[in-house]
Amino acid sequence: MYQPDFPTVPFRLGLYPVVDSVAWIERLLEAGVRTIQLRIKDKRDEEVEADVIAAIALGRRYNARLFINDYWRLAIKHRAYGVHLGQEDLETTDLKAIQAAGLRLGVSTHDDMEIDVALAAKPSYIALGHVFPTQTKQMPSAPQGLAQLASHIERLADYPTVAIGGISLERATAVLATGVGSIAVVSAITQAADWRAATAQLLDIAGVGDE
């Protein structure tokens, strides 16, 4: 039963790009994306605060679901739509502060044990990955593949889910066929020969999400 301790999100968040700059946030929101994440790694809060402020402002302008990866204090301070955390961040994050601020929470998982940990936090959505091999970040776990993803989806039933990891334009339809609510993409857009065309095609497949 989907009863999170955080504000709910639609079961289908649609196409969900994960990008590392405000420039990408702006161009993708202009292109019609309505769920997006700013993921900047390994910088101090003061180094990324201006980018977080700018990203959140863009999210409001386009009435989009703008998630901030990791920098939960800044997300609370500047009232982002939501925060996304990795498993390693859950123990060091004040989840009650995020909850009290009314922000949505997404949590990454890589196996059944991590899904248990995520469910205990009762987040707004659960990310499942990595589905395929990915060059975007070093991953200690093995790719899950479509069969394992489908198994996780069956277990999570009505919980909003996001598949991530190595999802290309060519693989997007097969990933969504598992029943997952949304697909997160990185290089499928940012490294595409024509990012506008790739975004438009992915939006055709995954949509912009439910209201």
Curated annotation (Swiss-Prot):
Group of enzyme by EC: transferase
Gene: thiE
InterPro entries: Aldolase_TIM, ThiamineP_synth_sf, ThiamineP_synth_TenI, TMP_synthase
GO-annotated molecular function: magnesium ion binding; thiamine-phosphate diphosphorylase activity
Job of this protein: Condenses 4-methyl-5-(beta-hydroxyethyl)thiazole monophosphate (THZ-P) and 2-methyl-4-amino-5-hydroxymethyl pyrimidine pyrophosphate (HMP-PP) to form thiamine monophosphate (TMP).
Residues engaged in binding Mg(2+): D70, D89
Pathway involvement of the protein, from the record: Cofactor biosynthesis; thiamine diphosphate biosynthesis; thiamine phosphate from 4-amino-2-methyl-5-diphosphomethylpyrimidine and 4-methyl-5-(2-phosphoethyl)-thiazole: step 1/1
Enzyme nomenclature, EC number: 2.5.1.3
Family per similarity comment: Belongs to the thiamine-phosphate synthase family.
GO cellular component terms listed in the entry, alphabetical order: cytoplasm
Cofactor: record remark: Binds 1 Mg(2+) ion per subunit.
Domain of life: Bacteria
CDD domains to which the protein is assigned, alphabetical: TMP_TenI (cd00564)
Keywords on record: Magnesium, Metal-binding, Thiamine biosynthesis, Transferase
Positions of 4-amino-2-methyl-5-(diphosphooxymethyl)pyrimidine binding: Q37, L38, R39, I40, K41, N69, S108, K137
Lineage: Bacteria, Pseudomonadati, Pseudomonadota, Gammaproteobacteria, Enterobacterales
A GO biological process held by the record: thiamine biosynthetic process
The protein's required cofactors: Mg(2+)
Protein name listed in UniProt: Thiamine-phosphate synthase
Record field: catalytic activity: 2-[(2R,5Z)-2-carboxy-4-methylthiazol-5(2H)-ylidene]ethyl phosphate + 4-amino-2-methyl-5-(diphosphooxymethyl)pyrimidine + 2 H(+) = thiamine phosphate + CO2 + diphosphate; 2-(2-carboxy-4-methylthiazol-5-yl)ethyl phosphate + 4-amino-2-methyl-5-(diphosphooxymethyl)pyrimidine + 2 H(+) = thiamine phosphate + CO2 + diphosphate; 4-methyl-5-(2-phosphooxyethyl)-thiazole + 4-amino-2-methyl-5-(diphosphooxymethyl)pyrimidine + H(+) = thiamine phosphate + diphosphate
Binding-site list for 2-[(2R,5Z)-2-carboxy-4-methylthiazol-5(2H)-ylidene]ethyl phosphate: T134, Q135, T136, G166, V186, S187
PANTHER family attached to this UniProt entry: THIAMINE-PHOSPHATE PYROPHOSPHORYLASE, THIAMINE-PHOSPHATE SYNTHASE
